Each structure stands twice: as C-alpha cells, then as structure tokens.
Amino acid sequence: TDLIGVPIKMVEAVSQTIEKQHGIPRKSLMFTCSHTHCGPALDHMLSFMLDMQEADWDQVRAYQQVLNAKVIQVINAALADLKPAQLSTGNGNCQFAANRRAPKGLGPYDHQVPVLKIASPEGKLRGLVFGYACHNTTLSFYQWCGDYAGFAQLDLEGGHEDIVAMFH
C-alpha cells in the first residue's frame, strides 16, 4: 500500500483482469494506499509535477505493468485462500497528528485510529486494517518508504504471527 495514490488506469486494468478471471465486478473491489510521499512514481499520476525525461517515463510505465501484475497476483492468492472469518471493529488513539493550518493544537484534528480486525472463527488474528488522519509526509528524502504508516504495518505484523496489516 506504499503508494501516493492509485491511478484510475491501474484500477481499470486490474479490475478488468479480475472480472475476466473470476467474475468479480469492479464495484466489489477496493483499491487503497497509504498516500506516502516516499512512494514510486506511477503512470498517469501527478505527471505534471515531475520533471522527468521520456526515458524515465518508460521506466515508470514498465514498473506500472509489474505493479499491476503483482496486484493481480495478490488478489488471485487471496481468492485461492478464502476462509470463514470474524470481523470486528474498534478504535485506538495516537497523538502525533497536528493540523498544519492551525498548529499549536488550535485547529481541528482527529487522534482516533479506527481498526478493522479479521480473525478466524476460533479467534486467531489474521489481519488488521487501520487508518489515521495524518498525512504520510513525516520523511523528507527520495527513497521508497511507507513512512509512518509503513512502519506501523511492520510493527503490527512483527508482533503477531502470520497476519497482514494494511493502512487505509
């Protein structure tokens, strides 16, 4: 999920393939990302902001094809491993977000961390989907990184055996 966004052309290409392979319509798929500003450039995504040569865009388009194929692979793997699950929700709390337009705690902010928990019928944790209302711009370098959301995912996965954590 370490992308700044999901280009509509990617959504269309992946959705068409999944519908063709499995009969699952686009409206039944959810595409999400962490909106990290340390993610890769994608085709048809903020190109007006990037001063890149055509050879660079060729690399971006090649990467986009690889990414599309990997997303399709992940969806296929998930569909091949469908199991009954229990879903539950909760809210955590985190205190580092701030309103950049009204700093010093004066502006509106949301410190809640909504969580969707996915567990087996026996209660074994299988996955977590969570969010936080804070822009993924805490880092300031040009290397691929999930920013704070990516580190949170790694921490959650490291603390639990065989789970997938996703920031939304």
Residue map of PLM features:
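Conserved beta-alpha junction segments in alpha/beta enzyme cores
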Residues: T1-H168
